Structures are given as structure tokens and as C-alpha cells.
């Protein structure tokens, strides 16, 4: 007995929809139903993250988050999860650290899928924001009282030279890219 009141876990999108389409893998749904039921039975609130670095390979093969089609696929996935689990889940996180997904995955290449293309990173940023909004709407249709949000990795932008306008502007640009894109859009 850990004495915890809540447990955050991620649902693996490929475990439920291996090809990223609408063809369900029932064994995946069964697994998460058992997990959620066990948490509820133990008096622990399940808190779900829908995306934490596990895009179905078929979607990545079509350029992943840099392809706008992923927005509809994510919305369909969120709808299916809300329908299957929403009677026991009140707190939903759509995407874990979308900045990392977009920039570290598509611009810097240090995270999957390891791309190094600024334009792909901008597209991925746009599509993760759209996917978050679409998933939020989809969950709210099924679970109107649910709390839905993002997990955002905030970065402290500290300006060492407030009298130097170039430094001030650069700090504002970094804050916009690292933080504001995600927290001010919603």
C-alpha cells in the first residue's frame, strides 16, 4: 500500500490501434480496462495520458506529426478511449510535452523520429496543437465533466541583459517557442 490517491499512466496508442487507423486491437482495450478497474477498486484515481512518445508506425511512415492527417487519427483515438474508459476517467492529458515531440523529434533529431528539419518541426508543432484541441473536444463530447489538458515542460527564460534590446527580443522569441506556443494557445 503506497498511500497514493491518483496514478498517472499512458495509454499506448499502437496497443489499441496498431496501424493508427480505426481497426481496434481488443486485447489492448482489455488490458487497460483491467488496469483502470484495479485502480478504481483500490480507491486510486486513474489519470490518463493519451500520447507519450508512441505513435503508431504506420502514421510515422506518413511523416508522423508533420502530416496533418495525424490530427484526425488522434481525434479518432481520443474518441475511442473516451468511449471505452471515460466512465472511470475524469482527468485526461492529451499529449505529453508537445514541444519535445515537435522540436526534439523533428528539428534537433535527439528524440524519435530523429528528424532534423525545421519545417517539419513547425508543422509538427502546429499539428500537435490541433490534435490537442481536437482530442479535447472529442473527450468532452463523451465526458462533458472531464478535466482535459496538456503536460507542458516549461522552460525558464531569464534575461541577463534587460538593457540590450537584442537580448530582450531573443529571450521573448525563445519564450514564445518554448512556452507560449503551448500555454497561450489554449
List the predicted regions and their residue ranges.
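Non-catalytic scaffold segments within catalytic domains of secreted glycoside hydrolases
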Residues: 1-5, 16-186
